[in-house]
Amino acid sequence: MLSLALIAIAYWPANAEPLAARQRIAFPDARLDVCGLPWFNEDKPALRRLPLRLKDRFRPAVWDLAQDPSGGRIRFRTDSTTIGLVAENPHFSNMHHMASVGENGFDLYVGREYVGSAWPDASGKMAKEWRVSRERRMRDITLYLPLYKAVTIQELSLDVDAHLEPASPYAIAKPIVYYGSSITQGGCASNPGGSCQAILERKLNADFLNLGFSGNGLGEPALAEAICELDPSCIVLDFWGNPSADQYAAALPVFVDILRRKWPRMPILVTSPFYFPAEQSGGDVARAQSAKRLTTQEFVEKRRKGGDRRIWYVDGLKMLNREQTAGLVDGVHCNSLGFYFNALGLEPFLRKALK
């Protein structure tokens, strides 16, 4: 087992005082890859998940949530021993069931290793410097953006003589697109890098796009049509959480039909509900969860029997079951442990679909 002293050689907290000489890189910059926000080049420097030109196609609630850059990442390679960030989160808030870092803040990773986080002060401003190593060599850096609040980035900074270049490409460069609810959006991971999608990104070395919309993942055709503008490797439909059982049964076939008109062979995974503790007492929650599980399974089976062999049913109970409820923060939304369970359950299906 490594001692804390040995760990500290590689990573230690940022200095209390800013480093004097810095190489400052205004955002955006061609050497900084913006991932998970595929329409960024249309609307830059805005960090949003849907393009401005499609605004009128979406309900206002969906458009407002699209300003939250969940799944967005800034990636680059550098030999700098320190990384600095200046950003602003003007509308930061604190939900009662979600850590402020996950809701409002940033995570910094070197390769696949977590280094630290940044979060806004009382005025919504962030100025953070991380010391990532004593050793001078090129590394891939990933900065995960907030899951639930809009943000602007003013600049990144490096050692004054450091090199900067675009990040190493993902092994799976075409993004996995996830569409769904607040759970899909990342509620309630403690950190931006702790969402299910971010965990799978690191496991699979795969780019991704998060189109989870808190309370508003209703399977609307406008979202399917927006996805059809992209070039994904796989699509994960995870929107069981928001519609009623009847709404879900009506929306799912329409959503998939739109995708299939564009991509007859695109891998599509459809998840069913994971376990809610309220199910054990029966009642409306148990009935709705059971109905959605049955709808999902029967829909996928019917498609496959009809010749669509590139669609798969993902049993949500493989993503979080009754024995894993410590992974829930409020009986519904996942904490970071819950998202780890989700990722473990979804990973084998993704690996199969992406072969």
Task: Report each predicted region and the residues it spans.
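Glycine- and acidic-residue-enriched helix-capping/strand-helix junction motifs
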Residues: 95-98, 186-194, 286-290
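A short helix->loop->beta-strand "cap" motif at the edges of active sites that frequently abuts
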Residues: 263-268
